[in-house]
Structure formats: C-alpha cells, structure tokens
Design a protein with these regions (language model features):
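Membrane-interface micro-motifs in multi-pass membrane enzymes
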Residues: 4-5, 22-29, 228-236, 277-291, ...
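Alpha-helical transmembrane segments
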Residues: 4-18, 267-269, 311-315, 370
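Internal transmembrane alpha-helical bundles of multi-pass membrane proteins
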Residues: 13, 280-460, 472, 645-658, ...
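Non-globular, low-confidence helical/coil segments that flank catalytic cores
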Residues: 122-135, 161, 352-358, 413-753
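Structural signal for the C-terminal ends of transmembrane alpha-helices
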Residues: 22, 39-48, 64-66, 245-252, ...
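Aromatic-rich juxtamembrane segments at the membrane interface
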Residues: 158-290, 296, 595, 602, ...
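Membrane-interface helix/helix-cap signal primarily in integral membrane proteins
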Residues: 2, 58-226, 532, 536-540, ...
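N-terminal leader/targeting segments
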Residues: 1-74, 164-167, 179, 286, ...
Length: 753
C-alpha cells in the first residue's frame, strides 16, 4: 500500500494524541508486544488494518519515549549521584542552574538527562558551558495541581526537565564559558545601562529572567506576551534579514554565480545563528525546523499546499520529540499557524482592498482580527482568560517590534565592536520604551473566563466554520440536532448543592466553601518570596469557577494560613474577615459564635474568647452542616487544644468529613478526637517535599484504624467534596478530576513521609 507523506503525517499526529489523555502508561513489555503485533498486521492485505497498524506502531514509539522519561526519574532520584555535568543555563540571580548530566558513576548518559538544581553558595561564578564534577541529590518535579492552575509536571515533562534538586559538592573541570555565554555577557555590557535592557535580552537571547513581574503582567494582559518569546515571527524576521543580506551580496557577484540556492543558504544560516543565540528554546527550534522543511520543499521544486506543510511540520516535531505534545506553547504555535492558513484560505481580503501601500494598515487589521477570532478558544483554554485590548495592542506593537526593534537588534548582533553598535542598542531600547508607554495607556483589559463560558467562547469560531462551509444551508437539521445535543448535555451535567474544595497550596491551608455562586474561604494559603497563594492560586481559581467570595475565616495567624489575605482583599475590597486575632476590622471567631449562610449552618467550637495570640492551639474550629452532611474544619490545633475541645464540645464534633489538624503532624489527631468526630473522610493539606515529613505515617494509620479514608493534597492535588441531597463524594484532581499519566506521583512512592 502506497501512502503519501501527507497521509503518513496525519497518521503520526493521530498516533500522538493518546499521549495527552492516558491515565497511566503501559509497561515496556506491553509496549513491545503491541509494537510486535502492529508489525505483523502491516503485512495484512487490508488497507484499514494496515493503517491501524501504522498508527499503533507510531503510538508505541510515543509511549516508549514517555516511558524513557519516567525511567530517568526512577533511576536518578533515589541516591546521591556522582556526576559529570555541563551547565546549560544559569538564572540571573546565580542561585539556580539547568544542567545536563554527561556521566553518572563514570558511565555515559544517553539520552541526555536534564535537571534544575540549586547552586551551592561559594565564590565561584557559574556560567553556561562550564563542566563540573558534582555530587547531586535529585528528586522528581512535583506540581501543585488545581483546576485551571499552571501544570508544572506537564511543563517539566514537555521540556525534559523533570528532575530537580541540589548540589551537595562541586569541583570545576572546565570553567570556560560557552561561546554563546561569552557573547551574551560581552553584548549585555554594551546595553545593560539602558532602561529596558531586560526586554532587549529577551528579544536578542531568549532569556526572560530579567523581565520584572510588573512587565510580564503588562504583556500578558495586553495579549503581547508572544512578542517576548523568540518564536516563528522572530526566526522569520532573522531569515528575512539573511535573505536581504544574500540578495545584496549577489549584486557584487558575476551573473554566472547568481542563483536561487545562495539566498536560501544564507537565510538558513542567519536563522540558525539567531536560533542558537536565543538559546534554542523549543518555540525557536520548532520555527527553525519548519523553515528547514519549507526550504527543502522550495529546493525540490514541488508545490505543496499550506495544510500539507503544516501536517508535515507537526508530524516531524512529534516524531523527533513525542513529549512535545504536552507543551502548551507547542499547541499555541501549531494553532496559530493553522489559523493563518485557514483565515487566508477561507476569508481572504478582497483584491480591491489589498492593492497599494495604503492597504497595509487594512491588511494588518485583517490579519489581527482573524488571529483573534480563530485563536480565541485556544487562548481561553491555555490562559483561562482573554485580553480585551489584544487587538489594538498588537496592531500597535507588532509593527514596531517586527519592523524596528528586532531588525535593530539583529544589526547590533551582526556588528559587534563596531562604532554604531551602542547606537543601535539605544535605538532598539527607545522603540521598546515607546511600545511599553503605549501599552500602559491601554485600560486593564484582562477578562478571566469561567469554566461555564468556555463553550460559549467557541461559538464565534463554530459560526464561522458553519457559514464558510454552508452547513446552515445544506444540513440545517443535522446542525440543529448537534446544537440540541450539546445544549442537553450541558444542562444535564449534575451539579452539587454545595461543595468544599481544599486547594493544593503546598504547605499551608486554603479551603473554599461554595454555594449558589458565592464562597467563603477558610484560610488563604502561604506567602513566598515573590508571590503568595492568594495571587497565584486562589484568585485565579475563584475567577475560573465564577465564584464571588463574601467571607474569609482565618483559623490563626501563621503565615502559611494568612499569606494570601492581602492579595484577596485587594481583589475584593468589600470581603469580610472573621478570626480570633482580636483585629479591629475582623469579626470574632470564638466558641459560641454561630450563623447561617445560604441555608448552611456555621458553628464555632474553638477557641475560647480569651484566646487571641493566633498560635496553633488558638485555631478557629468551625463545624459546617446542611442538616444532612457535616464538615469539621480544625486549622492547626494540636493535642492540648484537641483534648480541651473534646472536654467542652464532645457531642457537637460529629461530622462526615474532617480537615486533619496541623497538616497531620505527630503532635495532633489524638484517637479520642477521631472517635468523637466519627467521620468517613480525612483531608490533609500538605506539600510533598515538606521539611517536617507530614503527614506522619502513624497519624495516617490512626485515621485508617478509625474508619477514615485518608486524602492529602500532596497525593491528590486539589481535593473536592461535592454534596448533594443524596450524599457526598470526595474527588481528587490526580485520581478523579483529571487523571493523566503525567499528573501522577513520580519517583519513590510517598517518599516525603
């Protein structure tokens, strides 16, 4: 059976899709057995069987690659490793580095193993390209997982950096920095004094670590963040720069030496150099591969359709690196190119409007409008929101960045040590300043998208497709049937009467009680050096769920429970706070307080009125019930407070679900308390790699002995309790809400206990 390259490409893309959806990977023996069966089936003289066998065979290659990534985790995350490494990248603050293991125990490592490590404090300056002998303590990346949150595990796998750890000791083998690192350092010294040097570094070298949080937020909210990541547009500009350079050189050559291959070769050379200078990040690599394929097609003299080239590029990328299918930036790039092809194929600008220089603004508007409409569903899915100012912001920023800033940077990179180098960098900096000045003038236009609206976001794209193919004329009944089926499916999704969600905030606590679109927060998570759980996790989660928080209950005053308070109050200034901290603006949270909220009964059982210090044993213990199901929230109380609580309110403690006190420490969860509560489920908020190795193994066993099903956020991610009139159920993110092989607990089972 003869198959075209386009057909093989489509089969490859189909074969890669299950890698996104599988809850777990088959064993290596199963993969080999499937591959052997597929090879046998390829000789069957039936077209459909042969096609299926080819898909299975390519799927086996994808699964084998994924298995290989997990094998690296299992092999290199158990003991301290003596390794020879090369430094790939160092963070601007010099505290962390990405390394590549060359040898382990004097054995060469293949395929390469990458890790992100904390560097030891010493006088030596690290830089990319250096070779070191290190003793490494590595462990798998373990992500905090919540609905709509950044998926660090998936990101780490897609970028082949699933190991992290620390350097126990290090001795230098070769301290010479790489040519790129030396060039970067020398070049930065020329423009480092300029106001927007961080943006220049991002555009020239692909290093975005110097961009401030405020600037990153500005680019995200105006929909211009893609301009700061070196990708197809930037590599294309470099290729165009190379083509112009080559054509200029050809004016100096004899006519017999002038041909079409020379400009193509220089185009590839310049684009390749820029890809290398930019650090060869995945988006730049993808663009370079696409350029190579396009060049090969041009040289071959074949006339391929845009969709065929797209299929071939996507298939080639997935064959070379199957885990790329887990990358959100890959999907954004792929859909962006597909949107361009579809827009110009389906909705071309009329010829009467596309003639002459005056038509360029209209062409740009046509392009941006098409990208905005067609990319709407993908952007909403990836970013959980949309920028309302993206169209005008991009209409302003893209011409300046693409026609002025990047060409100036390319000229400056091509003319190092020349008299005009510093002037070129200054001009590039001024162009960036103008763009940022205009972006800051736009009103805040970021719109968080609720889960319930994600389907509606797809309607403009669906309407365009229906109109373009004339389905509303040719198949109105089928179209109406599909719409009715979708509406019925959406309306019949079972909804709980109320729910309780323990968010995965690492070491800390944040619980959301929600009903009828309103919410109460019990604690607000931790605060870290540059962010907090409120800003990073809780606020985006509430916005995605379409919830309006009305109250915050602070269990006590420790930072891992109050870290996100300020950010949440800034987002919702009218929110009320209840605590036992004797704060002037806080409502009291002491034993004896009770109230109703949307037919839910809240009763405070602890602490005593005199307790205001905000320590663990002064935690505000709250019982919530609807008359059928009860939940007991205990904060961080320990043995002393637990026994006092038992003595004072033994008969009021009964509940179905218990929030495990003090993250499951060995100083809490006494057996009499567990028997008095007589619950069925125990929920613990804890980080996998916490310094205290919580929850304690003895405490977990104590819960199990008393009939509780034990859940913790380190294992499950977000834990959701959905309550209906018929009962309740506990759903973990990793095991129920989104069970995927790349969400699982990698490495030694429960190795932080």
């Amino acid at each position: 059976m003869n198959l075209s390259l386009n057909q093989l490409a489509i089969l490859t893309i189909i074969a890669a899709l299950p890698l996104m959806l599988l809850p777990e990977l088959p064993s290596r023996s199963t993969i080999l057995a499937l591959a052997a069966l597929a090879i046998v089936c390829t000789v069957v003289p039936l077209r459909n069987i042969t096609l299926l066998a080819l898909v299975v065979l390519m799927l086996c290659w994808m699964l084998w690659s994924a298995r290989g990534a997990l094998w690296q985790v299992e092999t290199y995350s158990q003991n301290i490793l003596p390794a020879r490494v090369v430094v790939d990248r160092v963070t601007p603050d010099g505290k962390r580095a990405q390394i590549r293991l060359l040898t382990v125990h004097e054995r060469w490592v293949f395929p390469p193993v990458h890790a992100s490590v904390a560097l030891p404090k010493q006088d030596h300056v690290y830089c990319a390209g250096q070779r070191w002998q290190m003793r490494l303590k590595l462990r798998p990346v373990h992500s905090q997982l919540n609905e709509g949150d950044f998926d660090q595990q998936r990101y780490a796998l897609a970028n082949h950096h699933i190991l992290q750890g620390q350097v126990m000791s290090a001795s230098v083998i070769d301290e010479k920095c790489s040519i790129r690192s030396q060039f970067l350092t020398n070049t930065q010294s020329v423009y480092q004094h300029l106001p927007w040097s961080g943006v220049l570094t991002a555009l020239a070298f692909g290093e975005r670590g110097e961009l401030s949080a405020e600037l990153s937020k500005l680019f995200r909210e105006t929909g211009t963040a893609h301009l700061m990541a070196i990708s197809g547009m930037h590599i294309g500009l470099a290729a165009g720069f190379g083509w112009i350079l080559a054509r200029g050189l050809q004016f100096l050559l004899p006519a017999k030496w002038i041909g079409h291959l020379f400009p193509l070769a220089i185009t590839l050379l310049v684009a390749g150099l820029y890809t290398w200078l930019s650090g060869a990040h995945p988006p730049a690599q993808r663009a370079m591969l696409a350029l190579l394929l396009w060049t090969a097609i041009r040289v071959s003299g074949k006339n391929w359709h845009g969709w065929h080239i797209w299929n071939l590029c996507i298939a080639a990328l997935l064959l070379l690196d199957p885990l790329m299918i887990l990358s959100e930036s890959f999907w954004l790039s792929a859909f962006a190119v597909a949107a361009l092809i579809a827009w110009y194929q389906w909705f071309p600008l009329p010829e009467s409007l596309s003639q002459g220089i005056k038509s360029y603004p209209l062409k740009l508007l046509h392009l941006q409008a098409g990208m905005m409409i067609l990319m709407l569903p993908v952007q909403a899915w990836v970013f959980s929101g949309l920028s309302l100012s993206a169209l005008p912001a991009n209409l302003m920023a893209i011409p300046v960045i693409s026609l002025l800033t990047v060409p100036l940077i390319l000229l400056a990179l091509a003319l190092p040590f020349s008299p005009i180098e510093e002037m070129l960098w200054w001009l590039a900096d001024r162009s960036v300043a103008a763009v940022i000045l205009c972006l800051r003038a736009f009103p805040s236009g970021w719109l968080a998208i609720e889960d319930a609206l994600l389907m509606l976001i797809c309607l403009p794209l669906a309407a365009l497709i229906v109109w373009r193919f004339g389905w509303w004329r040719h198949a109105p009944l089928s179209l109406a049937g599909c719409c009715c089926a979708l509406a019925i499916w959406r309306l019949t999704i079972p909804k709980p009467e109320w729910r309780v969600d323990m968010l995965d905030v690492g070491h800390g606590l944040a619980i959301v009680i929600s009903k009828q679109g309103k919410a109460i927060l019990y604690d607000t998570g931790n605060r870290w050096l540059n962010s907090n759980a409120g800003e990073r996790i809780i606020i985006p989660w509430l916005e995605r769920k379409g919830l309006q928080p009305e109250w915050i209950i602070l269990s006590h005053g420790h930072l891992d429970h109050t870290g996100g308070l300020q950010a949440i109050q800034q987002r919702w200034p009218d929110i009320s706070v209840r605590s036992a901290l004797a704060h002037d603006r806080h409502f009291p949270c002491h034993a004896g307080e009770s109230w109703q909220w949307y037919q839910l009964n809240f009763s405070v059982l602890w602490p005593r009125t005199s307790s205001t210090s905000g320590g663990n044993n002064d935690s505000c213990v709250v019982r919530i019930d609807d008359g059928r199901t009860a939940i007991l929230l205990t904060g961080d109380i320990e043995r002393e407070a637990e026994l006092a609580l038992l003595a004072a309110h033994r008969h009021q403690l009964r509940a179905d679900i218990l929030q495990v006190p003090h993250h499951g420490s060995s100083t809490s969860s006494v057996a009499p308390l567990l028997r008095a509560v007589a619950g069925k489920a125990a929920l613990t908020s804890v980080a996998r790699y916490n310094a205290w190795r919580m929850p304690s193994r003895q405490v977990i066993e104590r819960y199990q002995q008393n009939g509780y099903a034990a859940y913790d956020t380190a294992t499950e991610g977000q834990i959701s309790v959905q309550i209906t009139s018929n009962g309740w159920q506990v759903l973990g993110f990793r095991t129920h809400l989104l069970p995927r092989w790349y969400h699982q607990w990698f490495g030694v089972p429960r190795d932080s206990r």
